[in-house]
């Protein structure tokens, strides 16, 4: 009997503390965390694990630099703290990556002002990454000779993080961790209905 079939059998008539519907990044992380703490966890997904939003990311794990434009400081702070936590918790999966923005006369911000924003972003993130830099056109040429600097005023360089492997594998790592902790996980299973009876939820699922 294959792994999926064995997990389908466990779902049939099984009693669980938690049923997680959806095996994307949120469901997978929740399952791994709960199962590791001894909860009886079941995870289902109507498609494959990480088959929808969680496999259509850019692999970027960022702190929300763009949101500084709207002065959403708390949001940026929360995103930076989450990014930092992920880098520390999964050093083999997440790495720091440098970004460079080249700015000309038509850019909305001058290099010095963009540099102030990048520095604020770094400070809000507790200085966890390498510090940002304001770049002259000459520095941009040294770093990236392919970039034309004829009309550039300068640029900035700052850091965020990215998933080294693809996003789907990152998600499935949490599914595997949940399985190893005793969770029941089955893909291509849809949630049909649920009703409360005898102090418990009875759930009807369908093997698709």
Where are these regions (language model features)?
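Extreme N-terminal leader/targeting segments of oxidoreductases
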Residues: 1-18, 33-37
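Glycine-centered short loops/turns at secondary-structure junctions
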Residues: 22, 38-40, 182
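Glycine-rich Rossmann-fold phosphate-binding loop(s) that bind the pyrophosphate
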Residues: 22-24, 46
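N-terminal Rossmann-fold NAD(P) dinucleotide-binding loop
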Residues: 27-28
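Gly/Ala-rich phosphate-binding loop of Rossmann-like dinucleotide-binding domains
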Residues: 31, 35-36, 177-179
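Glycine-rich FAD pyrophosphate-binding loop
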Residues: 35-56
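Dinucleotide-binding Rossmann-like beta1-alpha1 core, especially the glycine-rich loop
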Residues: 59-143
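Helical element adjacent to the flavin cofactor pocket in flavoenzyme catalytic cores
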Residues: 161-208
């Amino acid at each position: 009997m294959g792994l999926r079939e064995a997990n389908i059998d466990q779902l049939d008539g099984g009693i669980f503390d938690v049923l997680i519907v959806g095996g994307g990044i949120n469901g997978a992380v929740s399952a791994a965390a709960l199962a590791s703490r001894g909860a009886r966890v079941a995870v289902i997904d109507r498609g494959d694990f990480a088959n929808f939003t969680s496999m259509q990311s850019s692999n970027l794990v960022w702190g929300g630099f763009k949101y500084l434009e709207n002065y959403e400081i708390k949001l940026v702070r929360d995103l930076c703290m989450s990014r930092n936590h992920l880098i520390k918790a999964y050093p083999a999966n997440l790495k720091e990556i440098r970004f460079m923005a080249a700015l000309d006369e038509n850019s909305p911000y001058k290099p010095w002002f963009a540099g102030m924003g990048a520095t604020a972003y770094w400070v809000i993130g507790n200085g966890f990454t390498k510090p940002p830099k304001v770049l002259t056109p000459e520095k941009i040429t040294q770093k990236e000779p392919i970039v034309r600097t004829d009309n550039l005023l300068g640029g900035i360089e700052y850091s965020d993080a990215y998933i080294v492997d693809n996003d789907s594998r990152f998600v499935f790592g949490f599914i595997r961790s949940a399985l190893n902790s005793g969770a029941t996980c089955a893909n291509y299973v849809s949630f049909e209905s649920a009703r409360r009876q005898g102090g418990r939820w009875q759930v009807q699922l369908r093997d698709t």
